C-alpha cells in the first residue's frame, strides 16, 4: 500500500473514470490515459467504487503504482478522489451488485433493507457499508489514504425518508467520516449530487447544504473536513447557477452561491453533457462556460488525444477561470 496523501490542492481539471465497459481493452486504455494525463499535468483523478464494477479504481491503482514505482511522480503529487454509497459489484469475480450483496456483504451485516432504490441505483447511508467500501477502495487503489471521499447521491435515500430521519442519518454518517479523517484513511470528504441539481424543482431530492455544513461543525467544529460539493454543471444544465434553491442565513441562493458562502469548493461533473454538448458547441465553449463559475471540473476520458485537446485548452485559456488555482501542467 502506498503511504501518504496529496500535498497539492485538487486540480482545476481532474480526469474522470466513469465511462467505458468492463473489458480488458478499456482497462488498458484507462491505465494509459491516466499515465498520460499525470505525465502532462493533470494530477487529479476521480473515480468511485461502483464505476465499471470496480475496474476503474483498479485501473487507477495499476497506473498509480507504475507512475510512483518508476519515479515519475510521488504520492504527494497526485490527488485522488472516490465515492461510496451506491451498491457495487465486482466484475473480476463475475459478481453483479445484487450477487455481490448476497455473497460478500450480507455476512458482514449489510442487507437490501439498508438501501433505497431509484431507477436501478441502490443507495445507503449506513456507515457499516461505507467502512467496507472504503477499505475495498483503498485496496483497489493501493493507497493508505484517499484525498477526497464523497457521499454518492444521498438524494436517493433522502427521497424515501422524512426530513428529520434523513438528517439524523447524515449526522451519524458524517461522524463516521470525521473519524476516518482522524484515522488517516480520508483527507477530506464531500457530497456528489445527481438528481438535486438536475431536477431542482423536485422537493423530494432537496438537501440543504447549510444544514449539512452545520452538522459537520457540530460533529467536529470549524476544523471539520467537509470541503467539496460535486454536481452536474454544463452549458446545457445550468440550474446550479440560475435557480435559487438553497437558503443560507435566511437568504435564498443558487447552489454555486451557497457553496461559496459556506466555503465549500465546487466540482463540475459532465461538462460536455454526456457528449450531447458537442452537437451544438465547441469544446472550448463548454469548458469556458464551466471554468468561469466552478472551482474544479471532472473530464472523463480514456483517450490520450482527447486529453491532449483538453490540455491545449487549459494551457492557453485558463486566465479567466474563477477556480482557486491555475492549471499546473507543464
Where are these regions (language model features)?
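Short acidic capping loops at alpha-helix termini that bridge into adjacent secondary structure
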Residues: 74-78, 144-148, 188, 224-228
